[in-house]
């Protein structure tokens, strides 16, 4: 894994000392097919999808729970070494490129 807890520099609009949580991420097995299956299932249940993301180290499916908390299902790219993943994550400051669900392989 490239990280267990990621501390990322906040954007300028962040209010210092405010209480909050950006999101909680849950790592999954099953690859991009599992992300597509979860996406379809969440939509079928009426869950609000935020976005699908290519993080360069893996793919994420962001959505909101009934209380408005932002959650993520995350699949890490296979065969990515810890060092490679940390380098990508560090150099790009947690890369996040929004993609369409159809772009998943």
Placement of each model-derived feature along the sequence:
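Conserved short beta-strand elements that form part of the metal-binding/catalytic scaffold
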Residues: 1-19, 64, 70-78
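Histidine-centered active-site/metal-ligand motif
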Residues: 2-3, 22-23, 55
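A cross-family glycoside hydrolase active-site/sugar-binding cleft signature
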Residues: 8, 27, 52
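Vicinal oxygen chelate
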Residues: 13-105
């Amino acid at each position: 894994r490239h990280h267990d807890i990621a501390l990322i520099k906040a954007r300028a609009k962040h209010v210092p000392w405010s209480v909050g949580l950006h999101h909680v991420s849950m790592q999954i097995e099953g690859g991009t097919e599992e992300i597509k299956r979860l996406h379809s299932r969440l939509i079928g249940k009426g869950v609000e999808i935020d976005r699908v993301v290519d993080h360069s180290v893996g793919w994420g499916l962001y959505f909101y729970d009934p209380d408005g908390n932002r959650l993520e299902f995350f699949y890490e790219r296979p065969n990515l070494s810890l060092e490679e993943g940390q380098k990508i994550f560090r150099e790009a400051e947690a890369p996040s490129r929004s993609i369409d669900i159809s772009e998943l392989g």
